[in-house]
């Protein structure tokens, strides 16, 4: 939205849909817009998109224009952890952001996830010694985040432990099954 803080700081460029009735993303239009506008970052994420995103296709587009690839997985993080939804990092994305509540079933909070020692995709490897996680850490702490709440950290650890259990896969499958039932009702 144009009045948000991020809209005042950044120039967001949107891509179209194949069909307004279905709301399906037009990846060809996304490609054309990326070639035209040469974005520094492509953000893939959604709250109300009822389909799986084609992370590989988005990664191909982003790699061609040299953009950082970031996926907002807040609504589907538990489905990814449960193995029923694709992990954007496996398709070539550099960064994922998520909440720790919603489908992860933890306390309110957030995460920024990278592939470990990923290089800075905005610079040639021989021209930088800083990797992407270091750059993100420097921007987030201490300016935006500091003074951790140990009770929240402990609660998140419990939620992450639960997400590693076999029963969590059953939960993720049931979420998908329930969603499909609601969609056909």
Description of each model-found segment:
Residues 1-185:
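Conserved PLP-enzyme active-site core in the AAT-like
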């Amino acid at each position: 939205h144009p009045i948000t803080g991020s809209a005042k700081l950044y120039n967001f460029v949107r891509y179209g849909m194949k069909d307004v009735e279905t709301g399906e993303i037009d990846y060809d239009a996304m490609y054309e817009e990326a070639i035209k506008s040469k974005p520094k970052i492509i953000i893939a994420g959604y709250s109300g998109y009822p389909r799986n995103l084609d992370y590989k296709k988005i990664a191909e587009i982003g790699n061609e224009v040299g953009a950082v690839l970031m996926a907002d997985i807040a609504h589907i993080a538990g489905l990814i952890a449960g193995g029923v939804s694709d992990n954007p990092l496996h398709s070539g994305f550099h960064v994922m952001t998520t909440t720790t509540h919603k489908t992860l079933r933890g306390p309110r909070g957030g995460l920024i996830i990278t592939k470990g020692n990923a290089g800075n995709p905005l610079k040639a490897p021989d021209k930088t010694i800083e990797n992407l996680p270091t750059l993100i850490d420097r921007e987030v702490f201490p300016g935006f985040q500091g003074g951790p709440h140990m009770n929240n950290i402990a609660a998140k650890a419990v939620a992450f432990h639960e997400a590693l259990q076999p029963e969590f896969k059953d939960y993720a499958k049931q979420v998908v099954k329930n969603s499909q039932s609601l969609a056909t009702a």
